[in-house]
Regions:
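Conserved short strand/loop->alpha-helix "switch" segment adjacent to the catalytic nucleotide/phosphoryl-transfer site
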Residues: 23-42
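Conserved glycine-/histidine-rich ATP-lid loop and adjacent helix of the Bergerat-fold HATPase_c
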Residues: 112-121
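Short conserved segment of the HATPase_c
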Residues: 80-93
Length: 149
C-alpha cells in the first residue's frame, strides 16, 4: 500500500507548496495489494482535501500487521466543524461557519472517496485529529479483504 500512497503524494508535491510527511515504520505487510483504481482514487480524494485545508503540513501514516491495514491522513488546518462532522459523507455539504468560503465546500470529494473505499472493504472514519489541530481521515481494511480485491 505504501507504494500507491507514495505515488499519490508525489502527484500533489508537484503542485502544492505544502509539506507531506509520511510514516510507514509500522507497515509490516509483505503482500502486494492489487492496484484498484477505486482505492487509488478514494485515497487521492482524501489526500486532496488534506492538501486543500492544511496550513503547511499533511501527515500520512501507514500501519499494518497480519490482520489489518490502516492509513491515517491528517492535516494541520482548522479541522471539521461540528456542522460538517454531523453530515460527513453526504454530497454537497458546506460549512457556514468556516472562515475561508473558497475552501468551505466539502461534500462531493468526501462522498465519492468514502463510497469508493467502503465498496472495496474499507472502514472510513472522518474526525478531528486527536494529536494535531486539523482533520483526520482513518482508512482501515481487514487484510483478508484486501488480498481478495
Amino acid at each position: 500500500m505504501f507504494d500507491y500512497v507514495r505515488e499519490i503524494i508525489k502527484s500533489f508535491e508537484n503542485i502544492s507548496k505544502k509539506e507531506f510527511i509520511i510514516n510507514n515504520s509500522q507497515d509490516t505487510n509483505s503482500f502486494k495489494v492489487t492496484k484498484l483504481i477505486e482505492i487509488i482514487y478514494g485515497i487521492r480524494n482524501f489526500v486532496g482535501n488534506a492538501n486543500k485545508f492544511a496550513k503547511k503540513k499533511i501527515y500520512i501514516s501507514i500501519k499494518s500487521d497480519n490482520q489489518m491495514t490502516e492509513i491515517s491522513i491528517e492535516d494541520d488546518g482548522n479541522g471539521y466543524s461540528k456542522e460538517v462532522l454531523n453530515k460527513i459523507g453526504e454530497p454537497y455539504i458546506k460549512s457556514s461557519s468556516y472562515d475561508d468560503k473558497s475552501k468551505s465546500g466539502l461534500g462531493l470529494g468526501i462522498f465519492i472517496g468514502k463510497t469508493l473505499l467502503e465498496r472495496n472493504g474499507a472502514k472510513v472514519i472522518c474526525r478531528n485529529s486527536k494529536t494535531r489541530s486539523g482533520a483526520e481521515v482513518l482508512l482501515t481494511w481487514k487484510n483478508k479483504e484486501l488480498k481478495n480485491l
